[in-house]
Amino acid sequence: MAGEDYSFTVFSKNAFYAELNARLVDLADVKSDLRVLDLACATGGVTRLILERINRTRDTVVIALDHSQTALKTAMEELRDISNNAVQYVQGGVENVSEVVRDSVDTVVFCNAIHYLPDKDKVIGDISKAIKPGGKFAFNTSFYEGGQHEDSAAFYNKWMFKAFRILRKEYNLKPVRSEKVESRRQLSPEEYGDLLERNGLKILKQKVDTVQVPIEGWLDISTFSDFIEGTMPGVPMDKASAALQEGIKQTYAELSVTHVPRNWLDIVAVKV
């Protein structure tokens, strides 16, 4: 099966995903920054977007940080045509950014991962320490209170109903709801604002980016471990993924749709 390692890589290759991240980088306005950190950079898709927009000087540094050595090696290969010695690859987790990145940065970009942080206050506080006064923290997420577009309620309800029925019928399994952890709770935009303010950051720009997601996007997100575990906690990964994918196919066919809208929350905050 494509995405059998259950990583985010398969989903991240979707064209619409690159486009929505490009809009976040544009919103952050990094062109005059000297030091930019791409947090949880994975294979370098967002790092490339930053490199394409930044005005390079001798002192320009784009830091690509990820916990996975394999992802960083792939990023090095993927960015070879554009990096031109401006990229610094750093292996480390998002939990200790200020220790790993010793010199403060102008901007931190953190795409589609903030919702997975178990202790958001701790991590955002540490990110804030790594940013220069007046510097920016830009992030986006589709997993927030408001991510489900109002026109897609029927799609989600039908998809989940079908996926759970397939799981029960084909595998005699059901999710273990007690295993759904607090970090999976989706914050509202207001709660994100409070989170930022508690950690010395103030919202500068905020917008909702509505994206038309094709069937491939939903099939691919159904191969990503964090999404699978959040949707079907306690179910073996392969069976949960198969049920979600078959549910998607049946739902798209039944509704006769080609795309389903999904909202992404884009926020750029400034360190005060």
Q: Model features per residue range: what roles?
A:
Residues 2-18:
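Class I SAM-dependent methyltransferase Rossmann-like catalytic core
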Residues 3, 204-258:
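C-terminal helical/coil "lid" or tail adjacent to the Rossmann-like core of SAM-dependent
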Residues 15-32, 49-52:
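Conserved alpha-helix/loop element of class I SAM-dependent methyltransferases that forms part
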Residues 35-97:
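Class I SAM-dependent methyltransferase SAM/SAH-binding core
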Residues 106-120, 143:
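A short SAM/SAH-binding and catalytic strip from SAM-dependent methyltransferases
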Residues 121-133:
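A short glycine-rich, Lys/Arg-flanked "PGG" loop and its adjoining helix->strand segment in the class I
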Residues 138-169:
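Conserved class I S-adenosyl-L-methionine
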Residues 184-199:
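Short alpha-helix
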